[in-house]
C-alpha cells in the first residue's frame, strides 16, 4: 500500500466558538478517505492502539507549502479532516471554497 495520497477538495470552515476565527480544513472523503482508513487500521493492528483522537500523522504539500500535522476522523467514519493553519492559507492565497490540490504522506 502506498503511503502517498493525492486528492483535490474545497477549503471549508467551521465555527468553533463565537468571537473566534473559524477553523479552516479540507475534508478527505471517498477513495482517498478509504485509503487513509485502511492505513490507520493496519497501524492499529500492528501497534495495538490508536493515536490520540484516532489521528494520523501526515506530511502535507499544498502548492509550494510543506508541513507536518495530523488528520482527524470525521464523525460517523465518513473520511478525515485536514486542518489548514493561517500561515499556509496566507502563503498560498487560499480562501473558503477554493479547490485545493493536496498531497499527503502518511507517517
Predicted regions and their residues:
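Long, compositionally biased stretches
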Residues: 1-78, 103
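Short, compact, well-ordered microdomains
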Residues: 68-105
Amino acid at each position: 500500500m502506498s503511503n502517498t495520497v493525492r486528492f483535490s477538495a474545497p477549503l471549508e470552515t467551521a465555527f468553533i466558538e463565537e468571537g473566534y476565527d473559524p477553523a479552516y480544513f479540507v475534508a478527505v472523503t471517498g477513495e482517498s478517505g478509504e485509503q487513509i482508513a485502511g492505513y490507520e487500521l493496519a497501524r492499529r493492528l500492528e501497534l495495538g492502539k490508536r493515536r490520540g483522537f484516532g489521528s494520523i500523522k501526515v506530511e502535507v504539500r499544498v502548492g509550494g507549502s510543506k508541513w507536518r500535522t495530523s488528520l482527524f476522523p470525521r464523525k460517523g467514519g465518513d473520511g478525515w479532516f485536514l486542518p489548514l493553519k493561517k500561515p499556509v492559507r496566507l502563503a498560498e492565497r487560499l480562501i473558503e471554497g477554493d479547490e485545493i490540490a493536496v498531497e499527503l504522506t502518511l507517517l
